């Protein structure tokens, strides 16, 4: 059987013919192919089909990597179609299976470990087998093709867009931390010059914009703050600037403070831009997951799993506790209850649920999210499909979950398509609101001796004597007096309880409970002491044992008295006789 060897190079396809039909079964193959002369004695070139350009080479090699037979390769194999009893050695088993499926090609394919030595020799001595191919040109073409193939793989990688989401959500979290640190630093720094501003203005971004706009607090009269602040807060800021107790700063200090304030404003604007970019990316890549859990929670789930494909392979139970691995393994180690939710806890549907319903909603939401993820990762859509059609599964599942949650919680249904905030209310588009900071209410202060003298009770020099009604005249007085006595007794009882509880070293409520259960004992002086349940049980057991012993003694004494009485009766009878 004639043996042909298919060789793919960066220059083109080469079809080699073995001079020995049993070449692959030889034991001395590695020694025979060690030199170029030995390889040329064993193999000869049957046909060589050169690539026209670097782009053609990239297309051909990319198809070979995926295990596909190109028309150029099929045309090369047509040359051996008419020969009888032919075997073809192929380096890639996947490519060998694809060649075997070609119609009209009756060839025995060899794609196993027996071809390893012969292919190693061909790659090492390829310029000697193909005439006109220089080693320098071969190395240059191989390097260029490898770079092009790497760029092609990176361009069409299914995980490349996931990387954008992972990086965006990580950057968003970092921006929040840095923005908070920078804003606090601006307040502390500018607070030396204008400390009252932080008490009046609560918003960090508005504070930074105000520092940039006003500069020194002495410029409050000429500065137009209407673009930043509402009228009432603007008036409060200007009034505070007029009578501020802050220290004076130099122009150089102000320039550095304003430079930091510019960073705060710039970071806040970029954060808004990044958040909108992340929302658009999530709606394009994982529309069903975004419809169910939101873009931020969905992005954190994808970042935690590494990619959308990895996340779609996870079952619903893994998706439910993703992000709570430490708590899970700690619970398994200590044999405690495992956590019910991880990152998915921050989804708005779970935020609406209360109590035990949170765990139920987490379980159901994870199940629906896992189905939506598989659609997002594996579905192949046509170009004319709209975004609403892609997210139809997630939107319908969210509507059903909202209806189920409303039935469990007993709340009215939210309108369909309305985003729901974690507190259960429909989420409105965010607005730039400036709220005045909380201030200390000085009017709420109260002192004991602050009352005016006129308000204090003064002793009357002459007391008026009023007529007292007789008890028989009005029966209501008896009831009033009885009520007063009962209230006095209750007050005395409360005070006594508090004293006894202090002596026992317990709170009043605990003292009352133990007193009702009989767990309080009193000594000879009447001081209470708390007794534990174990001590009470031991005392009861000892009392039972003691009572049993007394009963036995009584029985014995009764038996002895009965014997004595019988003897006395016998003696009396004898005397009478």
From Swiss-Prot:
<dbReference type="GO" id="GO:0000480">
    <property type="term" value="P:endonucleolytic cleavage in 5'-ETS of tricistronic rRNA transcript (SSU-rRNA, 5.8S rRNA, LSU-rRNA)"/>
</dbReference>
<dbReference type="Pfam" id="PF01798">
    <property type="entry name" value="Nop"/>
</dbReference>
<feature type="compositionally biased region" description="Basic and acidic residues">
    <location>
        <begin position="485"/>
        <end position="502"/>
    </location>
</feature>
<dbReference type="GO" id="GO:0032040">
    <property type="term" value="C:small-subunit processome"/>
</dbReference>
<feature type="region of interest" description="Disordered">
    <location>
        <begin position="445"/>
        <end position="577"/>
    </location>
</feature>
<protein>
    <recommendedName>
        <fullName>Nucleolar protein 58</fullName>
    </recommendedName>
</protein>
<keyword id="KW-0698">rRNA processing</keyword>
<dbReference type="GO" id="GO:0031428">
    <property type="term" value="C:box C/D methylation guide snoRNP complex"/>
</dbReference>
<feature type="compositionally biased region" description="Basic and acidic residues">
    <location>
        <begin position="544"/>
        <end position="559"/>
    </location>
</feature>
<keyword id="KW-0539">Nucleus</keyword>
<dbReference type="Pfam" id="PF08156">
    <property type="entry name" value="NOP5NT"/>
</dbReference>
<dbReference type="GO" id="GO:0000447">
    <property type="term" value="P:endonucleolytic cleavage in ITS1 to separate SSU-rRNA from 5.8S rRNA and LSU-rRNA from tricistronic rRNA transcript (SSU-rRNA, 5.8S rRNA, LSU-rRNA)"/>
</dbReference>
<dbReference type="GO" id="GO:0000494">
    <property type="term" value="P:box C/D sno(s)RNA 3'-end processing"/>
</dbReference>
<dbReference type="GO" id="GO:0000472">
    <property type="term" value="P:endonucleolytic cleavage to generate mature 5'-end of SSU-rRNA from (SSU-rRNA, 5.8S rRNA, LSU-rRNA)"/>
</dbReference>
<comment type="similarity">
    <text>Belongs to the NOP5/NOP56 family.</text>
</comment>
<feature type="compositionally biased region" description="Basic residues">
    <location>
        <begin position="568"/>
        <end position="577"/>
    </location>
</feature>
<dbReference type="InterPro" id="IPR012974">
    <property type="entry name" value="NOP58/56_N"/>
</dbReference>
<dbReference type="GO" id="GO:1902570">
    <property type="term" value="P:protein localization to nucleolus"/>
</dbReference>
<comment type="function">
    <text>Required for pre-18S rRNA processing. May bind microtubules.</text>
</comment>
<dbReference type="InterPro" id="IPR036070">
    <property type="entry name" value="Nop_dom_sf"/>
</dbReference>
<dbReference type="InterPro" id="IPR002687">
    <property type="entry name" value="Nop_dom"/>
</dbReference>
<dbReference type="GO" id="GO:0030515">
    <property type="term" value="F:snoRNA binding"/>
</dbReference>
<dbReference type="InterPro" id="IPR045056">
    <property type="entry name" value="Nop56/Nop58"/>
</dbReference>
<dbReference type="InterPro" id="IPR042239">
    <property type="entry name" value="Nop_C"/>
</dbReference>
<feature type="domain" description="Nop">
    <location>
        <begin position="285"/>
        <end position="410"/>
    </location>
</feature>
<dbReference type="GO" id="GO:0017069">
    <property type="term" value="F:snRNA binding"/>
</dbReference>
<dbReference type="GO" id="GO:0005730">
    <property type="term" value="C:nucleolus"/>
</dbReference>
<dbReference type="GO" id="GO:0000452">
    <property type="term" value="P:snoRNA guided rRNA 2'-O-methylation"/>
</dbReference>
<dbReference type="InterPro" id="IPR012976">
    <property type="entry name" value="NOSIC"/>
</dbReference>
<keyword id="KW-0690">Ribosome biogenesis</keyword>
<keyword id="KW-0687">Ribonucleoprotein</keyword>
């Amino acid at each position: 059987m004639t043996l042909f060897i298919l060789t793919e190079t960066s220059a083109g396809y080469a079809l080699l013919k073995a001079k020995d039909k049993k070449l692959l079964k030889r034991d001395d193959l590695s020694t025979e192919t060690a030199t170029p002369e030995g390889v040329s004695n064993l193999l000869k070139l049957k046909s060589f089909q050169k690539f026209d350009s670097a782009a053609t080479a990239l297309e051909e090699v990319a198809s070979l990597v995926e295990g596909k037979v190109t028309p150029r390769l099929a045309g090369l194999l047509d040359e051996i179609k008419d020969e009888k009893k032919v075997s073809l050695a192929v380096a890639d088993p996947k490519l060998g299976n694809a060649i075997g499926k070609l119609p009209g090609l009756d060839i025995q394919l060899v794609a196993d470990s027996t071809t390893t030595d012969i292919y190693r020799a061909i790659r090492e001595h390829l310029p000697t087998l193909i005439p006109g191919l220089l080693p320098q040109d071969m190395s240059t073409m191989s390097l260029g093709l490898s770079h092009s193939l790497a760029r092609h793989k990176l361009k069409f990688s299914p995980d490349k867009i996931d990387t954008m989401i992972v990086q965006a959500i990580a950057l968003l979290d970092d921006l929040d931390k840095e923005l908070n640190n920078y804003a606090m630093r601006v307040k502390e720094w500018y607070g030396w010059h204008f400390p009252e501003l932080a008490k009046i203005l609560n918003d960090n971004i508005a504070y930074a914009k105000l520092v940039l706009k006003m500069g020194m607090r002495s410029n409050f009269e000429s500065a137009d703050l209407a673009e930043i602040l509402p009228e009432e807060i603007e008036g409060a800021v200007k009034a505070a600037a007029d009578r501020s107790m802050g220290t004076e700063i130099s122009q150089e200090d102000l320039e550095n403070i304003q430079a930091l304030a510019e960073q705060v404003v710039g970071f806040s604007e970029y954060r808004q831009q990044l958040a909108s970019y992340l929302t658009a990316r999530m709606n394009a890549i994982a529309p069903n997951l975004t419809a169910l859990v939101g873009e931020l929670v969905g992005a954190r789930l994808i970042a935690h799993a590494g990619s959308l494909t990895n996340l779609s392979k996870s079952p619903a139970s893994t998706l439910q506790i993703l992000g709570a691995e430490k708590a899970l393994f700690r619970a398994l180690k200590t044999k405690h209850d495992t956590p019910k939710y991880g990152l998915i806890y921050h989804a708005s549907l779970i935020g609406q649920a209360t109590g035990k319903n949170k765990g139920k909603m987490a379980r159901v939401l994870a199940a629906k999210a896992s189905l939506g993820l598989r659609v997002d990762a594996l579905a192949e859509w046509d170009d004319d499909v709209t975004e609403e059609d892609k997210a139809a599964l997630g939107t319908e599942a969210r509507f059903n979950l909202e209806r189920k949650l409303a039935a469990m919680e007993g709340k009215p249904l939210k309108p369909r398509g309305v985003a729901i905030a974690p507190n259960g209310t429909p989420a409105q588009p965010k607005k730039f609101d400036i709220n005045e900071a909380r201030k200390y209410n000085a009017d709420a202060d109260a002192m004991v001796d602050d009352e005016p003298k006129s308000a204090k009770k003064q002793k009357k020099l002459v007391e008026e004597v009023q007529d007292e009604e007789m008890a028989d005249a009005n029966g209501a007085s008896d009831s009033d007096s009885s009520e007063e006595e009962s209230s006095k007794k209750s007050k005395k009882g409360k005070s006594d309880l508090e004293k006894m509880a202090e002596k026992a070293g317990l709170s009043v409520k605990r003292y009352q409970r133990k007193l009702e259960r009989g767990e309080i004992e009193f000594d000879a002086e009447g001081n209470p002491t708390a007794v534990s349940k174990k001590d009470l049980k031991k005392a009861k057991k000892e009392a039972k044992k003691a009572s049993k012993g007394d009963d036995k003694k009584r029985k014995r004494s009764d038996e002895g008295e009965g014997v004595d009485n019988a003897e006395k009766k016998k003696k009396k009878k004898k005397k009478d006789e």
